[in-house]
Amino acid sequence: MPKRTDIKSILILGAGPIVIGQACEFDYSGAQACKALREEGYRVILVNSNPATIMTDPEMADATYIEPIHWEVVRKIIEKERPDAVLPTMGGQTALNCALELERQGVLEEFGVTMIGATADAIDKAEDRRRFDIAMKKIGLDTARSGIAHTMEEALAVAADVGFPCIIRPSFTMGGTGGGIAYNREEFEEICERGLDLSPTNELLIDESLIGWKEYEMEVVRDKNDNCIIVCSIENFDAMGIHTGDSITVAPAQTLTDKEYQIMRNASMAVLREIGVETGGSNVQFAVNPKNGRLIVIEMNPRVSRSSALASKATGFPIAKVAAKLAVGYTLDELMNDITGGRTPASFEPSIDYVVTKIPRFNFEKFAGANDRLTTQMKSVGEVMAIGRTQQESLQKALRGLEVGATGFDPKVSLDDPEALTKIRRELKDAGADRIWYIADAFRAGLSVDGVFNLTNIDRWFLVQIEELVRLEEKVAEVGITGLNADFLRQLKRKGFADARLAKLAGVREAEIRKLRDQYDLHPVYKRVDTCAAEFATDTAYMYSTYEDECEANPSIDRDKIMVLGGGPNRIGQGIEFDYCCVHASLALREDGYETIMVNCNPETVSTDYDTSDRLYFEPVTLEDVLEIVRIEKPKGVIVQYGGQTPLKLARALEAAGVPVIGTSPDAIDRAEDRERFQHAVDRLKLKQPANATVTAIEQAVEKAKEIGYPLVVRPSYVLGGRAMEIVYDEADLRRYFQTAVSVSNDAPVLLDRFLDDAVEVDVDAICDGEMVLIGGIMEHIEQAGVHSGDSACSLPAYTLSQEIQDVMRQQVQKLAFELQVRGLMNVQFAVKDNEVYLIEVNPRAARTVPFVSKATGVPLAKVAARVMAGKSLTEQGVTQEIIPPYYSVKEVVLPFNKFPGVDPLLGPEMRSTGEVMGVGRTFAEAFAKAQLGSNSTMKKQGRALLSVREGDKERVVDLAAKLLKQGFELDATHGTAIVLGEAGINPRLVNKVHEGRPHIQDRIKNGEYTYIINTTAGRRAIEDSRVIRRSALQYKVHYDTTLNGGFATTMALNADATEKVTSVQEMHAQIKKS
């Protein structure tokens, strides 16, 4: 049946900011849905608070709202735009929860809006654990023994029935948030208390433990005529007990017999029928007991999910696009498969002739004190996917694509260490982020496959594969480079060994292995992902490498090509913002007639969508892999400055190998990154910098620190996201940093900078084409200097800086761009103190603020800069004027502290945010209030506020206290702060710090006395002492600020109404044109 004609306009709900458990796979699905529905002639309205997404680009929908995904705000959008239907299955758990709330509040009924893609009843039946259990029993499928609890008493009663260990999961949360495994009553009570708090319905599901069972997922698509297809089966390499988002997964499933696969296939279709999903994709998760084969259904998601993004990339079947078309009434047999050029209908189940491996990427090093063991609560921040012809090839490609310093199965422990075996056994039994490497170490240390299986419950089939790779490594180490004859080397390359890994084993440089391959003429061929195992011809160039005979790449000979290197797996400090820039580069250069080639290995992103570029190579972004693609494609230019640190690290080596790197030269990049060379440029331009020094030994550091003066910012050179960066307050602190945080040497110097306390930090994005400099935007940070720029909220235009100061910055940016010979994007960070401008750093590449600035000003900076790199000047493009919008845009960050209970949520020079939201308003206050609502912070307009500030903030705190009083707050203060306020005639209630006797601050927070807390600290001792305030505020959901500037911004926003007015991006940009 063709599409519905009773619907003219559709509202798509996005997923909001990137958090652990809900990443950019929903930008990928949302962008596909927008395209698919507009193709069919529908008017598309989109709401998503995350500016770093492709789907919020003004050309993706007819009306785009970068507004909080909150039912009251969405109600305003519905009232204004009057859509006929709402599609909630593209924006993850956020969108589903929002849609259910709109239904509950009667908004959909009030404005006559139909829900498409899923019914409220189907969502509820899948998400409500009790209804789901009943539904499964009805169709004869088994579920885990479980019970539901809404209070601690109920929970304990369920535990008595289910027994220990048991698994606790809160309802309606994402990525297992708040859940865990309890082995005893004490752990059980702790997890339940947290879970009840985090579930929006205060509901817990308590299950019997399935730890050690095998876990599988089926990606299913079903239409209203009951056509049902399995897009892909996915097997978890790690057994149950580790969240599927944190498990290594493999597609298609490797260890099922055909009979078991058919049983699971039929069961998953039965689940969709029973739940009532009839227009879209779902994923169904199963567990199998390896001892007796008992099969149970764990859960199903009635929406597009993380796994469906993986399944789409693994098979080439665009699940989100198909689901969007099914939602408006099409059936599978009416839709054509794009990848085969319409030679097959969408009702054909994809078949694949390769193996796909996904490995999660973790960032525990950012969270001191976090529990880094893997459990049922998701903790990974990104993932990498690799494709190979065998399990071994695909696994080894994924390992090197992860960018954690491994080129394959690099050893984690030295076997000479007497503790080695103990450590290996511990790591296998209680999995952390690196377990896969410890498995290889276990085989090196002489454990048998059975021995490893007993510790890990990982299927023996997978273990045998790894054991074989370890034995081959031993052979390479034994024979050395002279023993690598053509046949042996080909065998190793077929099993996925990287040149760099073989070089390490043979004790030579990587270049020597490459030379050897050239001698043997041993190079990879490229195979296509075509959904049909090469049964039909394909027009889509979606490729992966493998060492076989026949190459299917067929590169064009007569076209100018530009290759864009992507950013690899998401991680903190390098996220979706960089992917956004890569996509824009590809789109702009395609429009200009170039053939574009994308190289990336992140399955969640839009850049790895088969129709974003002309040609897609799904490969690790490493020197070896990139050089092999260049060998075949011979591009005219390669762009390295858009994918963050990943491709930048390769710039010099690529240039040395004769690859045409376009844009800012690798040498110029080095001039900005290398401290000494940069210093020369700054001196020549006579710019001011905070006093600084570069040191290569601890005693030298102590001497230099005396000259510069404390406090100091200390960090290793060449880092992204502020890794191992700290503020130190005295010599003892400095010595501790050198002993614990870094290994310093001539090759790895450490930088010392005078820390400008209380300075205002500013970010400037600009583009230079060699003749002129375009200022993209000047952003004033809300948190003062010392908080990593990626963790600070910021405002465009600036909300306190004078015009003169901004002009000084404009001139300095221009001088720097010419001095460093920038071609393309650059980002400069300044600090302003006592009306003086200090230069902090320059990055001659795309910065993470580019998408935000583009949305705020309407200038697509990444596209403009890509054209500059390809040789088109700013004047030719007609983009020469800095745009200062007639409204305020505020970017606010989203932090993952709720996933890491042991971590202090104090902001500092290490970046820890996972995502961002944007708020727009006529005043700074309104924009800031919207950004707060978008980032889910719970701001109360009145109540009792607690003030506890450091020495340096005591002058300004009086002004803040007066503002809070005027707003109607009652005030509490700790001793030192209370004295200062008392002198100014404000008399707060005095409260005890934790070590001053009870009732103390923590008691009062627990009793719910506060609606707002401001706590600023300086100095290691004070930070340790006050950590309990910040953790308690987070745990009991009290809005808190850890900087005074944040406090002032918050008080300004208290009087603004974040839900009163909604403005689309298209309307915003029209206002700019008028002004």
UniProtKB/Swiss-Prot annotation:
Binding site residues for Mg(2+) 1: Q285, E299
Domain ATP-grasp: 133-328, 679-870
Binding locations of Mg(2+) 2: E299, N301
Chain positions recorded as Mn(2+) 4 binding sites: E841, N843
Annotated ATP 2 binding sites: R715, R754, L756, E761, G786, V787, H788, S789, Q829, E841
UniProt binding sites for Mg(2+) 4: E841, N843
Statement: the UniProt record of this protein carries the keyword RNA-binding: no
One Pfam family in the UniProt entry: MGS
Listed GO biological process terms: 'de novo' UMP biosynthetic process; glutamine metabolic process; L-arginine biosynthetic process
Protein name: Carbamoyl phosphate synthase large chain
Species per Swiss-Prot/TrEMBL record: Salmonella typhimurium (strain LT2 / SGSC1412 / ATCC 700720)
Lineage: Bacteria, Pseudomonadati, Pseudomonadota, Gammaproteobacteria, Enterobacterales
